[in-house]
Amino acid sequence: MGALSVRDSSGVQIVSNPATVRGDSGCVSVDSVPMLTIGGAGAEGSYDLLRASGALRLPDGGVVVMNGATSELRFFDHSGRHLRTVGRLGSGPGEFRRPGAPLWFGADTLVVYDTWTARATFVSTRGGLLKSVRIEGVAGGGELLGRLSDGSLLLAIARGVTEGTEPGVRRDPVHLVRLSTEGVVRDTIGSFRGPEVAVRIAESSTVMTGAPFSRRTFFAAAGDRVFVADNAEYRVRVYANGRLERIIEKSVEAVPITASDIEREKAQRRGSGRDPSWLAWLDRLYQRDQLPASFPAFGRIVVDAEGWLWVSAYAPSPGGGFAWDIFDASGRLRCTCQLPSGFRVREVGRDYLLGVGSDADGVEQVRLYGLRRSAQGAH
């Protein structure tokens, strides 16, 4: 696949992109120095971040951060000064047990989904608690992906460990459903392959953990479109109003998993573990003939404020950092952008990029970078 090709198959547009963009001069550029940094070594109180699961930039230039370790939604102004905190650990109204990232629900409203209680909490951008809604028919788990243009919410529901779950590596289905703002399931968009997990049966429990070099399906919502991307291959499916509209492909060469890759990941997972039965299970899990031959085709996806699709590489580039492929709204690959290694993108606006990284001491920070779009990157 050496050149861009666009074809139609039974009413579905298939956009096949080459591995690189000819004459790629960069459709976007990201500043090397952040405009705003929150957290890091020496930070105290509300500025001390741990397991920041998400962040959004507010209309007034401020930032809201979900600090997962304390189940708090923290609001900061445009200079990084802490303004207020909403929520705490608990199961009551305005409290969270296992909160996900804050998501937009309208121009002045945020929504946070608690996977432990299967409850969506709506909060104003000024920090006021608006309402909490229990999702009907959902026992827990899942991930809230965003709001669609018709006002419905998009929720991915996966099955957890249940009685009778067999040991081994598996990919159970994830069901993508649309919800009303009252927590009622309207319809199901589809069922897709979930994350690849390894199931271990211990003496008194069943444990599920990520499989080595795990394949998984990523989801994103933007306007009336839903993006579904299984990184077993470089292919992103785009649904509009519940119907498959477009498939975006890119030509990539499989990157083989080497013996050193296996040993490095195994050592990271082993850590300081000493339990003999667990170590024996880990050895079996990482046997060469039990592993895939190559890495997943990509890392994750994000849809920006212009409706463009960003797809990250699975592994860092040789010089450090991660390459992100950027596709326009028609599915055409426009350019590739390098971002710092370890920086987890949470939101891409028209002129900014917001995410979570670590400082030189390994302490979490939320960082806001300026982003410029060239003529070819402007909508």
Show where each model-derived region lies.
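Eukaryotic scaffold repeat domains enriched in small/polar residues
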Residues: M1-H379
